[in-house]
Structure formats: C-alpha cells, structure tokens
C-alpha cells in the first residue's frame, strides 16, 4: 500500500525478472493512496535537496514505477501515464539524481505509446552519464601523467556501464537510427578506458553496436568497430592455438570454439552490409585459423 507492505494470506509468486520486488500490488487501491501523498516543495528549485531527501526518492521512484507497470499490464495507459508524470513532476531528475532508477521509465513510456517522452528521457539520462564520462575521458587524455586512474576507476566503470546499458536497451527495441549518434559518442569518449578494462573485455561488449552503425549509414565507423573487435578475437584465437599442446587441451579447445562462435557472429553481422570481397577475405582468414587449430 503506497510505501509500506501489508501481510496478507495470499501467496504471490516471486518475480523472476526482479526478485527484490516483494508481494503484489492492488493498482487501484495504491493509486488512491499515492494521489493523496503530500510532496511539500519537492519539485521546487528554491530548496536544498539534501542527501537524505534524495535518497528517499529511491523507494518512491521504484514503487511508482511498479504501479505504472501494473496499469500497463491492465491496459490502463491513461493512469500509467499519470503516475509516470507524477514521478517526474514531484521528483525532477536534476534535483533527485539516482539516475539509474529512472531508466525503466523509458520502457514504460514506449509501452504506452509516448515515443517522444521516452526519447527525451533517454537523452536527459544520456547527458548525465556522458557528462561524467567526458570528465574522466578528457582528464585522462589531457593529464595522462598526473591523473590518478586508480582513484576514479570505480566511477569510470559505473558510468560507462550505465551508458552502455542505456544504449543497449534502445538497440533491443530496434531503435537503431535514434541510438546511432549515442553509439558514436560512447566509442569516442570511452575508448580510452580500454586500458582499464583490457582491450578484449572493452571491445567484446560492443558487438551489438556494429549493426546499428551500418544501418544508420555510418559504414566506416561500423567497419572500424568490427575490425577492433575482430582483432581482439583473432589475437585470442592465436594465443589459444599456441597453447594447445598444454596438458589441458580439452579446456583450450572449448575456449577456442567459444571464440570462433563470436568471430562467426561478427561475420554474420557484416555480411549484410559489406562488399563481398571484404567479407570473403575475412571469412577465409577465419577458416584458415580454424583449420590450423584442428591440424595442430
């Protein structure tokens, strides 16, 4: 009920997608309670939103989103929109922060047909993450000798992964054109972090970014990203091949097969967008590596 739980003799299955969401919601009852909440001056630009106030928004945002999703499931898009709007009206993004808690609302906006609002929220969150990433990225580039990477590594990982996740959610929805500029921004400002991640780990998580670049007409950038990812996989394949004679050859063969699967996935992506000669050349090189491993 609102912000509290009531113990009732009803068994509710655990939500496998989010096991932290306990119990069930009676949306109309909760709606009546939520509409009676007194927010004070929460949306005012003239007050200081102290850390505890902002921290309390975690529960409010989470529960309001749950309520909105229940209305969406019931097909009541009008009330779902009302709750979503209430959330951002009373807890403006700029004042309450904890940006990751607002990310699920993008999907909710899409579900109720509010495309423009969904994409506006995406852009607002993107700016928050990208501002942080730019600070660390430019600091590393301009003050390489004195920038204390170890002191900020956790923040770098956090904002990079949040930004990447934000982009991947749009890719899963098929919004390739819309998100293409964001992909270019991501690569431009985070590529310097590959020294922190390790080049292989940095690039391998960008496989899903290749196709949107091609589809949006950024063929040169798409090929460049393909090459960077492919070179990391090929290097890993060569390393595994050189170690095949070790006693743990079965394990190495399994690792090799996994990397080959990743390489073939890359080829399937570019096949639809690259000229035949380029694709054939890449395919032959991969087949040669595979044959050398088998015959060794």
Which residue stretches match the model-derived regions?
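ER/secretory pathway lumenal C-terminal domains and tails of membrane proteins involved
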Residues: 1-296
């Amino acid at each position: 009920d609102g912000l509290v739980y009531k113990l009732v003799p009803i068994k509710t299955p655990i939500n496998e997608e989010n096991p932290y969401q306990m119990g069930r919601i009676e949306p109309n009852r909760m709606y009546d309670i939520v509409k009676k909440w007194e927010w004070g001056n929460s949306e005012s630009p003239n007050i200081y939103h102290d850390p505890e106030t902002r921290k309390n928004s975690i529960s409010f945002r989470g529960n309001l989103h749950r309520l909105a999703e229940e209305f969406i499931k019931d097909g009541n898009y009008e009330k779902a929109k009302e709750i979503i709007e209430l959330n951002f009206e009373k807890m403006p993004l700029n004042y309450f922060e904890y940006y990751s808690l607002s990310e699920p609302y993008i999907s909710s906006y899409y579900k109720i047909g509010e495309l423009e609002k969904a994409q506006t929220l995406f852009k607002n969150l993107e700016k928050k993450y990208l501002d942080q990433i730019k600070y660390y990225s430019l600091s590393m580039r301009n003050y390489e000798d004195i920038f204390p990477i170890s002191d900020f590594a956790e923040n770098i990982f956090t904002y990079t992964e949040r930004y990447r996740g934000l982009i991947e959610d749009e890719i899963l929805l098929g919004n390739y054109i819309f998100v293409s500029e964001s992909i270019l921004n991501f690569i431009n400002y985070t590529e310097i972090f590959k020294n922190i991640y390790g080049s292989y780990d940095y690039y391998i998580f960008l496989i899903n970014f290749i196709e949107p670049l091609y589809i949006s007409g950024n063929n040169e950038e798409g090929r460049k990203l393909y090459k960077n990812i492919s070179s990391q996989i090929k290097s890993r394949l060569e390393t595994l091949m050189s170690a095949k004679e070790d006693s743990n050859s079965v394990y190495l063969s399994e690792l090799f097969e996994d990397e080959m699967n990743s390489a073939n996935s890359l080829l399937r992506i570019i096949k639809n967008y690259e000229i035949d000669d380029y694709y054939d050349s890449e395919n032959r090189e991969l087949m040669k590596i595979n044959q050398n491993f088998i015959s060794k």
